[in-house]
């Protein structure tokens, strides 16, 4: 099963994850530098793993899939072994 959520990345390279019913622009006060969507899947070891992608229309910001996914994995303690 895959779950899709939204996120922003702050200038301090911290990720804020929230549900699809909220707008990225609801977090404008946190001065985001990137924004997008995240899904959770299962890696080859059978552990949950995030994947970031896409663009925020409400903030007019793109994601950086590679960087944002690494930030998410670190902050959510889901680094691959």
For each feature predicted by the language model, list its residue ranges.
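Intrinsic low-complexity, intrinsically disordered or marginally ordered coil/linker segments
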Residues: 1-81
């Amino acid at each position: 099963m895959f779950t899709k959520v939204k996120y922003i990345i702050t200038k301090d390279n911290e990720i804020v994850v929230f549900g699809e019913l909220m707008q990225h622009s609801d977090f404008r006060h946190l001065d985001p530098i990137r924004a997008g969507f995240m899904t959770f899947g299962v890696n080859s070891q059978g552990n949950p793993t995030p994947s970031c992608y896409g663009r925020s229309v409400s903030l007019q910001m793109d994601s950086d899939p590679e960087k944002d996914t690494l930030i998410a994995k670190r902050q959510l303690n889901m680094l691959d072994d």
